[in-house]
Amino acid sequence: MALPHDSNETSYLLPPNNEDWDRQAIPDFVYGQKDLMAEGIQWPRNAPGVLEALPQSPFDAALCSAWKQRVELGLFRYRLRELQTQILPGVVGFVAQLNVERGVQRRRPQTIKSVRQAFDPEQFNFNKIQPGEVLYRLHREPDLPGTLLQEDILVVINVSPLEWGHVLLVPEPARGLPQRLLPGALRAGIEAVLLSLHPGFRVGFNSLGGLASVNHLHLHGYYLAHRLPVEQAPSEPLDPGGHLHLLQGLPAPGFLFYTRGPGLDLESLICRVCRATDYLTDHEIAHNLFVTRGAPPGKTSPSSALTGVRVILWARKSCFGIKDGEAFNVALCELAGHLPVKTSQDFSSLTEAAAVALIQDCRLPPSQAEEVQAALVALMSQKEQ
């Protein structure tokens, strides 16, 4: 069973004296099959925008208490306060937030020239972070299906947070893995979503060329106390087995994979998603991925229940570097409908039409998009043979 944050056996808080941080072993957050909550997680009708109004799982309690302590200790580049938020008028339902500090104070992205670029130990990587930035290690119990030698995943604060609880999931940083999605990393990301009782805890991945700023394998996880359009957007099946769908009603259509929760279905989904991302990486196609609780594929409505986990994959134009003049840069959260805006002027003037235009500018040319879709459908078909 997952250990609560106030357990006598495990503490996820740093000792008061920072000279002791180096000597403190990284605590384990151990979880098993019964800690993965696939059903019964829904948005409250009365206060969907209030994080504190929802119950916490042991995972939520451990993450939030340890993250809050790091805020108090000043380990972030800036102190994240309540962000000004607006739902942009229109049909999409964009959630825009003003986050000036992240736009100004975040670490400059590394120079990336290829989606397949090798790991460079001389560049910044997660072996170079301060000891206090590590919250704990995710450790799966043997009762969970999947690879027997599943690597441990470090949960690390993002020192330039998008939102409350913004962390990075880093698989065994000493291995020096480049930013290429692997099954163990994806499994940890999906299971983190299932470990949380909050419907707004999301996980995502940016490839190189898809605005990953560090070429060292990591996923993002964070809380956003608002519904996003990807949770319930309708979709149409692309393969006879119904394993791959095309998400509709969004500025950038994405490939939708869906699972009801832990078990063989989840393992099959991980295999299919990684086959797709391997294809994209091998063909130098940048991509972004987003994991959220959501409705099943097909025709959905705003009232559709969040009965499982949606994994959405976008193939997109490569973008090597940050476009400083734009209201926002398009990566995993923007494609999902969450828009962290850099300046007050852009925040006050941003419209749905302008946001749609920025996102659509990252779409692949139609001929290449059709080629990618056909290739991914073929990959799904091969898997079923």
Swiss-Prot record:
Q: Which PANTHER family match?
A: GDP-D-GLUCOSE PHOSPHORYLASE 1
Q: Source organism's superkingdom?
A: Eukaryota
What are this entry's molecular-function GO terms?
GDP-D-glucose phosphorylase activity; guanyl-nucleotide exchange factor activity; hydrolase activity; nucleotide binding
Q: Any idea what job this protein has?
A: Specific and highly efficient GDP-D-glucose phosphorylase regulating the levels of GDP-D-glucose in cells.
Keyword tags: Cytoplasm, Guanine-nucleotide releasing factor, Hydrolase, Nucleotide-binding, Nucleotidyltransferase, Transferase
Reported EC number(s) for this entry are 2.7.7.78
Q: Mention one GO biological process in which this protein takes part, according to its record.
A: glucose metabolic process
What protein name applies here?
GDP-D-glucose phosphorylase 1
| Main localization of the protein described in the UniProt heading | cytoplasm
Q: Which GO terms describe its cellular component?
A: cytoplasm
Instruction: Report whether Ribosomal protein shows up as a keyword of the record.
Output: no
Reaction(s) catalysed (UniProt annotation) = GDP-alpha-D-glucose + phosphate = alpha-D-glucose 1-phosphate + GDP + H(+)
* Stated family: Belongs to the GDPGP1 family.
Q: Which residues form the active site?
A: 218
InterPro entries, alphabetized: GDPGP
Subcellular location per the Swiss-Prot or TrEMBL entry: Cytoplasm
